[in-house]
């Protein structure tokens, strides 16, 4: 799954910098940078009404009465679920980040790992969104993990190579075909000193 990701305020990747700066200029409340958590307002790329990719500020997680926000959707079955079907067909988005975090069990502790595509400064996670009232909400699609991180978690976000990002935002392109191009070769870095005790 993906329950945390990271996008620095001052990123060496020029494209990420432009996205954050654009949103912070055009919105009264800045988007979250640093470690982004569920329900935070984050930077998301989606099509405008003119079908042009544009940065938007969206809340992370589909809000459902009496339940925790839905922050992830399984890419393999999302198109068949009423909650996600419209998003898969018409409301696709990209969530830019430097890396995402996942916790690995180690005895009675959990070790926090930063995970990112090998040799990449920025990554783009595939997502879908909806608008409730006037609030846009997004969820991140997940898939089976690459072989190098299967020991950490049994799911990972769908990370698209840059050449597939344009197709993902194009509703005329088959969603599952685009998602099949997802990046699976990732690296992980344990973050020393950042650990959480397991709840037993």
Predicted regions: what they are:
Residues 1-200:
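Short linear sequence motif anchored by a di-proline
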């Amino acid at each position: 799954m993906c329950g945390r990701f990271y996008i620095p305020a001052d990123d060496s990747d020029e494209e990420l910098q432009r996205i954050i700066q654009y949103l912070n200029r055009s919105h009264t409340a800045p988007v979250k940078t640093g470690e982004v958590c569920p329900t935070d307002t984050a930077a998301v790329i989606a099509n405008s009404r003119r079908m042009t990719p544009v940065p938007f500020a969206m809340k992370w997680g589909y809000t459902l009465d009496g339940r925790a926000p839905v922050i992830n959707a399984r890419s393999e079955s999302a198109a068949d679920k009423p909650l996600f079907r419209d998003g898969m067909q018409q409301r696709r988005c990209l969530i830019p980040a430097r890396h995402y975090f996942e916790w690995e069990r180690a005895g009675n502790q959990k070790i926090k790992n930063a995970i990112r595509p090998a040799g990449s400064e920025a990554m783009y996670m595939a997502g879908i969104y909806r608008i409730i009232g006037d609030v846009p909400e997004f969820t991140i699609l997940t898939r089976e993990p690459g072989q190098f991180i299967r020991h950490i978690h049994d799911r990972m976000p769908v990370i698209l190579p840059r050449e597939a990002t344009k197709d993902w935002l194009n509703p005329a392109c088959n969603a599952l075909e685009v998602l099949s191009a997802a990046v699976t070769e990732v690296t992980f870095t344990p973050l020393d000193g950042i650990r959480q005790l397991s709840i037993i």
